């Protein structure tokens, strides 16, 4: 087979081209069934060029995870100048819009990334969760005090988010039910776990 023909692009464009091809492949097949040669052929480049920009299949997958994570963070960013309840409802709605539009790759990567045995991939997935938690805390800092307690609750919410969104995309429930669950629980977490702890009563010496 003759090597694929490709046009000269700047490094950023070439990386995006390779990630776009990987996005399609990993959305259609399990991680283990996609090879560097598959990615190169889908992108219309040589294997050597994929190795040059990423190293190997794992690095391509990690690059894709990080790009999807950045897109997810953007969708969770609430609009300014609205009530806490309206911001939560809007960000959850935009999140569901994004996952619906990108369902195949989301189900294949972020939703199941923790199931991949490679420790580096699992670490990246865990880091994406921690980043999402930190951003959620910062997005709602005007109504919720950032603390270890709040971040613990938000990390649990991201697990609920993955499960609920997966069930909806699999057709087991409705979008409305998923939105209600995610928005109401996030609002409750911000209100309950983001509240400043009550001061302990002072002990009066006898």
Predicted regions and their residues:
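N-terminal intrinsically disordered/low-complexity leader segments
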Residues: 1-13, 194-206
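Helix-turn-helix
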Residues: 17, 25-59, 63
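Alpha-helical DNA-contacting segments of helix-turn-helix folds
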Residues: 61-68, 109, 124
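Hydrophobic alpha-helical connector segments
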Residues: 63, 77-104, 145-147, 179
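Amphipathic alpha-helical packing segments from all-alpha helical-bundle domains
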Residues: 73, 117-143, 148-156, 177-191
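Amphipathic alpha-helical segments used for helix-helix packing
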Residues: 99-122, 133-137, 162-169
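Short, hydrophobic secondary-structure boundary micro-motifs
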Residues: 107-111, 177, 198-199
């Amino acid at each position: 087979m003759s090597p694929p023909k490709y046009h000269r692009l700047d490094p950023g464009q070439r990386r995006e081209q390779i990630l776009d091809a990987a996005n399609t492949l990993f959305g259609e097949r399990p991680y283990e069934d996609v090879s560097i040669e598959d990615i190169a052929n889908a992108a219309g480049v040589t294997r050597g060029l994929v190795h040059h920009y990423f190293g190997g299949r794992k690095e391509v997958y990690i690059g894709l995870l990080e790009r999807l994570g950045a897109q997810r963070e953007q969708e969770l960013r609430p609009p300014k100048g609205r009530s806490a309840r309206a911001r939560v409802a809007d960000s959850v709605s935009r999140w569901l819009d994004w996952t619906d539009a990108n369902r195949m790759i989301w189900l294949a990567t972020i939703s199941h990334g923790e199931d991949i045995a490679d420790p580096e991939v699992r670490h990246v997935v865990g880091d994406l969760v921690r980043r999402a938690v930190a951003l959620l805390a910062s997005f709602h800092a005007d109504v919720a005090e950032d603390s270890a307690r709040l971040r613990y609750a938000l990390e649990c919410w991201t697990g609920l988010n993955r499960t609920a969104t997966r069930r909806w995309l699999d057709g087991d429930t409705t979008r409305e039910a998923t939105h209600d669950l995610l928005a109401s629980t996030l609002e409750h977490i911000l209100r309950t776990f983001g509240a400043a702890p009550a001061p302990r009563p002072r002990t009066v010496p006898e």
